[in-house]
Amino acid sequence: TSLNSQIAKTDQTTAEIYQSGRRVLRTRDTLYQEKQWIFDAQLDKAFSLGETDHQVTYGTTLKQQKVTGSREGGATCVAVGSGCTAIGAPSPMASDSVKKSSDFPDPTINTYSLFAQDQISWDKWTFLPAVRYDYTQLKPKLTQEFLNTVNPTGADPVSDKEKTWHRVTPKFGLTYALTDQYTWFGQYAEGFRTPSAKALYGRFENLNLGYTVEPNPDLKPETSKGIETGIRGKFDEGSFEIAVFYNKYRDFIDEDNAVVGGTVEQFQAINIKRATIKGAEAKGRLNLDAFGAPQGLYTQGSVSYAYGRNDDNGEPLNSVNPLKGVFGLGYDQDNYGGLLSWTLVKKQDRVDSSTFHAPDGDTSGPFKTPGFGVVDLTAFYKVTQDVTINGGLYNLTDKKYWNWDDVRSYDSVGEAAVTGPANLDRLTQPGRNVAINLIWDI
């Protein structure tokens, strides 16, 4: 049993010379805060029944999450001209400033879950039947900051209607020990995902740049049915696992949808009636000390591939990432260790261009993130039993690259309609950088 409370707050300030012709310094302050508490209770019971051994696990999870957000900004003249009468004076153009606003009503999200499973062992077989019940309640709060954004004139309808969803999802897993080293596994599982508060209620518009983000209060929860099978092996020299999966979705939630047609670019989350995601994953580790190398030296690697398809129109799913591989050479001892890793990502070449617009404003087609390779060096040192220092040198070669998730989700805030190369550059990942963490286990 555990009770956890967490507060996460992000406060970001940006400043830029937005339009070179007017020389105005624009500042934007963005705040996002999440408060949540989670209560977990889990019980286990082991017993034998005939020739079978049972390990029953059951419990509940209660979670409450409160989210708040706002943004505001101003502008200062850095040169005289184009309406600016003095250096340091506020910009006279109203569009340069942003009244304190929010793109979504502050939601309170209550989730309650019950789960139970029975791990049944018999001879070389293991059976794992499981069931889960989820209940989600979403209560939006219409703050003045949100109303400043979505309905400053009172012309548009604004809903603060509470949403509730619930569903029972089963799962059944199966393993068979082929030998002492090799195990086959398979699984059937159903999934359930509810829409976000931003997709249901959030609204934002920037008519000067010709785009709006609209809510969709009619979004349905997403459901899925999936199968997975594979084989894993474990030896003194290392381990490996290979798996393939196939998932079918109903009412797949696409939060990056661009509405085609109209005089103003419009973005709105939608349900895709039917969708499919399939793929394969492989990972492995080789203990090099088993072949005469120094004790603790190893190499590891993983490759993941997924293929997504909108079954309504045959187009790709933009939420599916390109082929990715991670390979590393590491050294571990009880109190210290390090890892040199190389991440390789293929160019994103499967994009539904009808629902995606390039953040660089290129009307010839969507921006497809190029492939890249990034090298990272990480290490850890255990100071005491409870205190560990870890850190790393990331992107050692100072590679300029984009993650597809960052580019595709840029659409969801509407800014893909903003032309200008700077918008694309600020979506790049950090160059060469350093991070150090201190972990204290209490």
For the regions a protein language model found, what residue spans apply to each?
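Membrane-embedded beta-barrel scaffold of Gram-negative outer-membrane proteins
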Residues: T1-T14, A177, T183-A189, A199, ...
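Transmembrane beta-barrel strands of outer-membrane/channel proteins
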Residues: T1-I7, Y58-Q64, P129-Y135, W184-E190, ...
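Solvent-exposed loop segments that connect transmembrane elements
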Residues: D11-D29, E72-S102, L138-K163, K198-P217, ...
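Face-selective signature of the C-terminal outer-membrane beta-barrel domain
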Residues: T1-L147, G284
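Short loop/turn motifs that connect adjacent beta-strands in outer-membrane beta-barrel proteins
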Residues: A46-Q55, K124, Q181, E237, ...
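Residues on the lipid-exposed face of transmembrane beta-strands in outer-membrane beta-barrel proteins
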Residues: F39-K45, L114-I120, F172-Y176, T229-G233, ...
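C-terminal beta-signal and adjacent terminal beta-strands/loops
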Residues: F192, R250, L297, K346-D352, ...
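Gram-negative outer-membrane beta-barrel transporters
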Residues: L43, S121-F127, T136, S239, ...
